[in-house]
Amino acid sequence: MRNRILVSACAALAMFAMQAPAHAAATDQLQSFVTGVKSARGEFTQRQVKGQGANVKVTGTSSGTFVFSRPGKFTWRYTKPYEQLLQADGQTLYIYDKDLNQVTERKLDGALGSSPAAILFGSNDLDKNFVVRNGPTRDGVEWLELTPKAKDTQFERIGIGFKAGNLEAMELRDAFGNTTLLTFTGMQKNPPLAADAFRFTVPKGADVMKQ
């Protein structure tokens, strides 16, 4: 389930009521992120929640680290409570489940599509894949709501929160009402990365499945 957050995705935790054009400041922060941040690294916490408002209940929490280089190169590593790795080299997405010692390979173009991963790790053609709408400001974080234009996606909305030009969080809700909140900390923008930083090596003895 966890890897679906990136490769097939979800949508907004907050059901934004306002449908006006997005605030210029929030839009500028989003555009600045997708065009100005060519690479980054940091840490994330991922929470699965149910309910809304005061009735929100956390049903699961995981955390880990990430690093990416646009377009299409990234490492998304879960470290708690279980280890799992999602890594892409620009052409292929590799999903490694340590407990099963199993690697799943997917063509990257089909795996990203109009997903949250496309926003974080893809190119900067957001207008091609999403409709951007205004969201609220909560605790100093300005939110945008992105709705995929494609009809065959597995999610409804993606909420993106920025503060002082930094990506703070993503709120995701899928078509089945499942909700995921991603929060980001310690993000370093445009750090130097080794040429082979995203080269995937199949772990010894691992089974490989191609999709």
Swiss-Prot record:
InterPro entries: LolA/LolB/LppX, OM_lipoprot_carrier_LolA-like, OM_lipoprot_carrier_LolA_Pbac
One Pfam family matching this protein: LolA
Signal peptide limits: 1-24
CDD domains membership: LolA
Keyword Nucleotide-binding: no
Gene3D superfamilies associated with the record: Lipoprotein localisation LolA/LolB/LppX
Biological function: Participates in the translocation of lipoproteins from the inner membrane to the outer membrane. Only forms a complex with a lipoprotein if the residue after the N-terminal Cys is not an aspartate (The Asp acts as a targeting signal to indicate that the lipoprotein should stay in the inner membrane).
PANTHER family recorded: OUTER-MEMBRANE LIPOPROTEIN CARRIER PROTEIN
Subunit structure and binding partners: Monomer.
Record protein name field: Outer-membrane lipoprotein carrier protein
Gene name, Swiss-Prot/TrEMBL: lolA
